[in-house]
């Protein structure tokens, strides 16, 4: 670790002040074991560019192992677990890790939005290849104002724009690449999407974040359309001034250009690609106003070409140019929750152990279910505040494509409770279409979700009640958890790890949502378990029992409860528990959506209304109205499509909309001609049975060499223009196909190769339906070949495989 002295210490919400801090150095850090407690004025600077609150706390508390006087454990943004720490000391250290100021501001945003837009939108793919012609990017009605206005009206506090995805296409006219809007026909090559989004964000008071993909396939040294690409070109590391003069980028990178107004230049010793990346970062961070988040994706679409990312230089530049910005993903400030479904863990700790100091830690994805329990906090670990961000697209995919279905408002509401309500920051992606507009089907579901959430939390039914606790710190009474201020809080009495708080309301209230928030910004995350009880007039009834709270925990019940007394029992805590706020809420009264069935093997779909209400539906992609077709019997959808349905209340109100997308032809009369391997209880026929919950699985203990093939006879010729692959939906990656070949035939011989060597980009993180278009052909037979799986076992699995009808077929 690198220590640099400072005259003073950092105060959380104020200026520097002189102070002494007690610190014990770790015994395994090349420090003499006889070294005693030092009382020094010190600050800790690491290459991430962070300034950390001190002290770093080492040693044992409350009782030192060798009988020395206990070392006080202070609040800090980092703690270190030494080999002689007791379990009590470890718990206390974890409870005294605090978020940094940029994290506090970010966590309080709660509802934030992604926007994915670029050449992929026009090509109907999730991952581009860097070989796209910039002329493909030509939106006809691009309106960034519409995007940001929709975000603002939906309760969004920040928009994170994908400024450059893996294809390397820049949505701003960068000085350092020809693969950008400047070489596209849009706005005559004079357009700048980043500028238009930044202006709209400023107009609507929405914070701005930027996504810049570390992987850049346009700059790949093996890209034939850019043979002089920087990525993986094994160039020498040279002294480079950022921003670099584009004219001398390769020949003399120490020659800088004029810095942006109000900013200065920086010098790093880096190779060509890192110099290129730093210059693009510099443009984004100096020309578009304040940046709240910098989003680094961990995906690498072509790992065959190696490039070392100089994260230390990247972080240093960000901290200097936009010190308030969060660095997400491959960075020290916020982590990916581990899925692309927007779902947080039921036990979500914001304090996590690092195996090395933040100075050298590589910030890998943390996808295990348990990443922060006390059992994970072991000797040699550094404890660090690292909150979760949950991301999910409103479509079943990140970029718009004509057939991608939209998530219903009901599903989005569920995700809200499982993201924001599970100690996470929610990042919901919107996907403008080829016009450059967010389509109505996305907006309709987004607005309904926001309406329900906003109406639900408009009134806290606990306000006006009296909150008491069976024990309290003298300075932190229970009433402070009902004052609407996250910077005041109730805290249990010293030494207490459990508590019981009772809320007595002036009159009975009916509610079905409970909100709890710890004082994480001042006291860290502590609560390990709690229960909620309701009084029925004669006894207490347990309504719910959960684990962590953190910044926010939301409990939503299927049935409301009416009572005038509520009890919160905190049954486990790492240190004296705290509550900054609590609330009781009643969900907005809306008619619940009907249930749309899966499509059966004959291509039929049924719709069920639990309360027997009439149901209306559409098949043309529009949201139903009370005048839409009334559901009376099973709907035939043999060639695929999307069903939208809603119940109609007795007063004529339309309920929440349900939707379900059915891709490809129904497997009517299909049969498996051959499969080179199959488990007896997971036969190949399960890949064409219309049931997403069954799978074809190759043998687990034999036939362990790829490729594996499945050949299907569709019974009659069809005009098709693509195929679909649904990976297994049980959460396992066993046999999930990553690389494939797809072939078709009219007679079962003389095969045509439609896709020779395709790849399902991002399938490891996104188990949604994969659609692969190709030029229309006539075929009766198709053959799917798995070339590579996500694992290394030589297996293949599939929930469903189908084909996409060509336009003429779809209209039959």
What are these regions (language model features)?
Residues 120-126, 399-401, 475-478, 625-626, ...:
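Short, solvent-exposed loop/turn elements at domain surfaces
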